[in-house]
Amino acid sequence: MIYVIYVQSGREHDVVAALRDKNINAYAPAHDLLERKGGVWRMVRRMIFPTYVFVNSEGITDELYYTVKNTVGVLRFLGRPPTPLPMSEEVRLRWILDVENLTVSRGYINSGKVTITEGLLKGREHCIVKYSRRRKRCTLYCEINGVAAELEKI
């Protein structure tokens, strides 16, 4: 089961490292992306779900709850009491959560239809809500714990 933790912005990697030091299976998926700064395109690494960390666990015991809750940077678990992602959402997000190194997606547009040839979004064209050719970015639609969200900068 996957539990979602809300953390301080910019502290995702610190929280993941601290939880892994305590033998807790935690991760915060990031991906490579092209950004233009000063007229030059650069490859940068960005969080897919900023301020969220995911924890794999068979259940939440009191010991696990307080170990995670007392970690520096953790604000709270999503859900009261902490509830795992429903299986339907877990299955939909598994393609992002299972991959360690998410690379830049590349593709083309033909007659207004986006086709991805390589990278994170290959085979996921149906999730794309909009595409910016100038910024070289796609926006995806997904749900996390019943809350609809659009993932930008992918």
Task: Indicate residue ranges for each PLM-predicted region.
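Short coil-to-beta-strand transition motifs
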Residues: 117-125
